[in-house]
Amino acid sequence: MIALCAALLLLAGPPQADPDPRALIEKAARSYRAITSFTADFKQVIADSMIGTYESRGRIVQAGESRLAMRFTDPSGDAIVMDGEHIWVYTPSTTPGQVLRLKLPTDPTYGPNVLAWILTDPARRYESRYLRNDQVAGRGADVVVLTPRDRTLPFREAVVWLDQFDNLPRKLEIRERGGQVRTLTFTGVQTSRRVGPETFTFRAPDGVRIVDQ
């Protein structure tokens, strides 16, 4: 019996090594740089021990580091838009009657573009480790944990599900320094589609006050 078990182990061969997480994230960064746009439906879940869990959905369109539109269908009307010069944060669901206008940061890691957070020079910015093989919406994904080397970055850990076909993120779990955990899941991803400039234009509705910060 012992001899049989030993023979079976020999036939099975040595255990397969995990993929190199640094190579995976660098490959994802190259794929990200190669596309001209990223479009997807998103589901966002923010978990906070103080305020509970907040779930939202919508559509995200991103083109380069400085142009992004997150337009929410739930809550309807909310939007975060980067137009190349400013970040517009419009949340009538919680703060009606005003829109915040912020100057665009020079470092994309400090703006709302979470893809740029993760995929801008990741080998230099983060320590990485391979977590597991998984699936997102039926697609194979490699799960990598990133820990910032720079403690001034706005999060202390990010778990990234990298699609095994196009290498781009399909899910992000970001542990922010304030204690919140934000999870973004992308479905229906399309890349390098032509995106008109109006996508990244925000026009304040009549009667809405613009608050500069």
Spans of features found by a protein language model:
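N-terminal leader/targeting segments and the immediate start of mature chains
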Residues: C5-Y54, E65, A204-Q213
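Extracytoplasmic/secreted envelope proteins and their assembly/folding machinery
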Residues: R22-I25, A29, P112-A116, V159
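Extracytoplasmic
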Residues: I35-S37, E55-R57, A63-R67, P75, ...
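Extended beta-sheet lipid-handling architectures
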Residues: A40-F42, E55-I60, I174, L184-F186
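Short hydrophobic/aromatic-rich beta-strand segments that constitute the beta-sheet cores
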Residues: F42, L68-F72, I87-Y90, L146, ...
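Hydrophobic lipid-interacting interfaces of membrane-associated proteins
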Residues: V45-D48, P75, R151, G179
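An acidic-aromatic
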Residues: R59-G111, R182-T183
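Gly/Pro-enriched, hydrophobic low-complexity segments
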Residues: V114-W117, A123-G207, V211-Q213
